[in-house]
């Protein structure tokens, strides 16, 4: 008797503990996304009101000092992008390391699809932007990376607003894709957008980073030691000319994920402890404040809005975020699924993947950061890029809403199925099923 091997499935459910962890993360990010949306709206209203001068005066107000010749006299807007976003990337780094060491990304068969989707979602938008601006000059081409990012908090806020009951597997895919996307984004920032590179400061940063690594590997949790080391690392990376948010990722990668016995099944390590402490600070404070100072752009009414959208920078960003993200993510997912002879998990359709791919076109936080790095905070191209990012994110959200709402009744059935515990063991029955 010949037994056929069970077909590989894309978007399979996680284990139940992983399902609970992902659900908790998404809940916090959804709240953060709502605050992010509120901060963005407040910034746009203030920046286009009769009192707009006070907004820009606040954003550009300098605070800090310059000890030992260090350049720490920064504007509030710069503190938000260089300092607060380092917390955001610290959380992204913790999540990425956990996924690769103790999560789904440690298994090639589960990792290949979200990684390929993230790469496709970065490469295709970058290509589209570059093709549109091929003859526009080097300055404009420098913005090629702006449409490569996905804002998970904003995307989850959209899901909350439209009240979709998206299956856990799809939400997990979106989160994992965004985590990989963040790694690619920070790599792009570090490699392609340094400013007056000073290698000696990078070398000096290795000292506090090494001490921080030693301390966390010893499972030391004392903030009297860890926080000063983290701040010194941040300062030295900032002085090096590499964007200071890179320090957040480097510090995160130093933190151990699993316990000393290195068995992922024995529970979380120090990384999850830090994540629990800092995720609310990142999602609820750091990112909304950054959005408040970064999203405020004086549009200049309808005439100013249409003028912004005639800039090839804006055209490239809008096309790349709306079309490029959808084509790149959907295309890569479809290609990997078909070439590995896998199939979508039961109850899912390719229209679900398309909806998620379009939703990933919401590229807000990191896109705004890269725009400032590419063009400079005071450049007209940066203002046009902000308008384009906001416009493209809104259009992507509306298109995704249409597609996902069509499937919402079906999602309700899947969500109900994921809550049935007929055997009363405390674990919904669908999570008891094994998928080899």
From Swiss-Prot:
<keyword id="KW-0812">Transmembrane</keyword>
<comment type="similarity">
    <text>Belongs to the NhaA Na(+)/H(+) (TC 2.A.33) antiporter family.</text>
</comment>
<dbReference type="InterPro" id="IPR023171">
    <property type="entry name" value="Na/H_antiporter_dom_sf"/>
</dbReference>
<dbReference type="GO" id="GO:0005886">
    <property type="term" value="C:plasma membrane"/>
</dbReference>
<keyword id="KW-0813">Transport</keyword>
<keyword id="KW-0739">Sodium transport</keyword>
<dbReference type="GO" id="GO:0006885">
    <property type="term" value="P:regulation of pH"/>
</dbReference>
<feature type="transmembrane region" description="Helical">
    <location>
        <begin position="350"/>
        <end position="370"/>
    </location>
</feature>
<feature type="transmembrane region" description="Helical">
    <location>
        <begin position="222"/>
        <end position="242"/>
    </location>
</feature>
<keyword id="KW-1133">Transmembrane helix</keyword>
<feature type="transmembrane region" description="Helical">
    <location>
        <begin position="74"/>
        <end position="94"/>
    </location>
</feature>
<feature type="transmembrane region" description="Helical">
    <location>
        <begin position="285"/>
        <end position="305"/>
    </location>
</feature>
<keyword id="KW-0915">Sodium</keyword>
<feature type="transmembrane region" description="Helical">
    <location>
        <begin position="315"/>
        <end position="335"/>
    </location>
</feature>
<dbReference type="Pfam" id="PF06965">
    <property type="entry name" value="Na_H_antiport_1"/>
</dbReference>
<keyword id="KW-0050">Antiport</keyword>
<keyword id="KW-0472">Membrane</keyword>
<feature type="transmembrane region" description="Helical">
    <location>
        <begin position="112"/>
        <end position="132"/>
    </location>
</feature>
<keyword id="KW-1003">Cell membrane</keyword>
<keyword id="KW-0406">Ion transport</keyword>
<feature type="transmembrane region" description="Helical">
    <location>
        <begin position="196"/>
        <end position="216"/>
    </location>
</feature>
<dbReference type="InterPro" id="IPR004670">
    <property type="entry name" value="NhaA"/>
</dbReference>
<feature type="transmembrane region" description="Helical">
    <location>
        <begin position="173"/>
        <end position="193"/>
    </location>
</feature>
<feature type="transmembrane region" description="Helical">
    <location>
        <begin position="384"/>
        <end position="404"/>
    </location>
</feature>
<protein>
    <recommendedName>
        <fullName>Na(+)/H(+) antiporter NhaA</fullName>
    </recommendedName>
</protein>
<feature type="transmembrane region" description="Helical">
    <location>
        <begin position="31"/>
        <end position="51"/>
    </location>
</feature>
<comment type="function">
    <text>Na(+)/H(+) antiporter that extrudes sodium in exchange for external protons.</text>
</comment>
<dbReference type="GO" id="GO:0015385">
    <property type="term" value="F:sodium:proton antiporter activity"/>
</dbReference>
<feature type="transmembrane region" description="Helical">
    <location>
        <begin position="143"/>
        <end position="163"/>
    </location>
</feature>
């Amino acid at each position: 008797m010949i037994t056929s091997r069970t077909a590989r499935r894309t978007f399979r459910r996680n284990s139940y503990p992983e399902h609970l962890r992902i659900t908790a993360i998404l809940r916090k990010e959804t709240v953060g996304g709502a605050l992010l949306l509120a901060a963005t709206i407040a910034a746009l209203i203030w920046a286009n009101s009769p009192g707009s001068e006070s907004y820009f005066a606040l954003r550009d107000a300098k605070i800090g000092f310059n000890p030992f010749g260090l350049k720490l006299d920064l504007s509030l807007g710069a503190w938000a992008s260089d300092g607060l976003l380092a917390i955001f990337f610290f959380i992204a780094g913790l999540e990425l390391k956990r996924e690769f060491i103790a999560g789904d990304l440690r298994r090639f068969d589960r990792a290949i699809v979200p990684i390929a989707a993230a790469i496709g979602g970065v490469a295709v938008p970058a290509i589209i932007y570059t093709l549109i601006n091929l003859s526009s000059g080097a300055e404009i081409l420098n913005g090629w990376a702006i449409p490569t990012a996905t804002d998970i908090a904003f995307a989850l806020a959209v899901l909350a607003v439209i009240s979709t009951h998206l299956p856990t597997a799809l939400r997990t895919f979106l989160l994992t894709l965004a985590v990989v996307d963040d790694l690619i984004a920070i790599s792009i920032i570090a490699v392609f957008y340094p400013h007056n590179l000073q290698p000696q400061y990078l070398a000096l940063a290795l000292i506090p980073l090494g001490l921080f690594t030693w301390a966390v590997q010893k499972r030391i949790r004392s903030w009297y030691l860890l926080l000063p080391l983290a701040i010194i690392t941040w300062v030295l990376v900032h002085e090096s000319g590499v964007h200071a948010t890179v320090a957040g990722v480097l510090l995160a990668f130093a933190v151990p994920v699993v316990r000393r016995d290195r068995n992922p099944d024995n529970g979380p390590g120090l990384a999850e402890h830090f994540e629990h402490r800092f995720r609310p600070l990142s999602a609820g404070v750091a990112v909304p404040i950054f959005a408040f100072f970064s999203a405020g752009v004086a549009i200049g009414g309808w005439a100013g809005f249409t003028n912004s959208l005639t800039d090839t920078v804006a055209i490239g960003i809008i096309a790349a975020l709306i079309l490029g993200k959808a084509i790149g993510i959907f295309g890569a997912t479809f290609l990997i699924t078909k070439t590995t002879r896998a199939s979508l998990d039961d109850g899912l359709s390719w229209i679900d993947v398309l909806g998620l791919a379009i939703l990933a076109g919401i590229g807000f936080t990191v896109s705004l950061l890269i725009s400032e790095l590419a063009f400079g905070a005071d450049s007209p191209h940066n203002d046009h890029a902000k308008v384009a990012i906001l416009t493209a994110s809104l259009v992507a959200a509306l298109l995704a809403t249409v597609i996902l709402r069509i499937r919402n009744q079906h999602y309700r059935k899947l969500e109900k199925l994921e809550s049935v515990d007929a055997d009363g063991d405390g674990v919904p029955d669908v999570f008891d099923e094994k998928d080899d």
